[in-house]
Amino acid sequence: MIHIFSSKGQVHLDGHKELSKNEPVVEFMPEKVLIPAVDNKGVALANLVEVGATVQKGSLLGVRQDFQIPVYSPVTGTVAAVVKVMSPVVGRPVNFLQITVEKEQGEEVKLAPLASDDKESVVAKLKEGGIVGLGGAGFPTYIKYNTKDPIDTILINAVECEPYLTTDYVEGIERISDVFLALPALLKASGAQRVVIATKADKVHLIEAIEKGIA
């Protein structure tokens, strides 16, 4: 049997979480950003915004062709160029949109609020929001809920095993109320009977935030 920490070739890395776990999330506004113009397999986005176009934070940049998932701009600015950049996800150079960021970001383009918490409405809103997994595959969240198979449990993974990373931990503390705000609609749409929020036992402050949210 292979053991994750003691088998040959396995290494237990130090977490180094102390470097950032007590730091607040701050907004960093660079002079330019690079947004992939392809999906996680390297296929070009459909309906891609043209070079020279002005975009707003939250405006549509393009659509993934495989699952028809929209990709939105994280900033307000101008599409300056399409450049080839090495993609750690695709594993080769691919096209990226280079957006010059405006100093004044203005209002964000926001989606209309969820009108109903029935399954069809929630699935449609998850798709419209472009919500996907962050593990590299970019698998659309709406597909997980758009199933005929019974769903017993919604699992929210805040374990964050990777060294140095504390995004889930800090965001969980600062924005746990957003999680609980969304859960009723997700529970109704999925038909799940329970929710499990997974984290590590030593993440005391996150556990306290979760327990406070439950109370």
Regions found by a protein language model. Give the residues of each.
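Well-ordered secondary-structure scaffolds
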Residues: 1-215
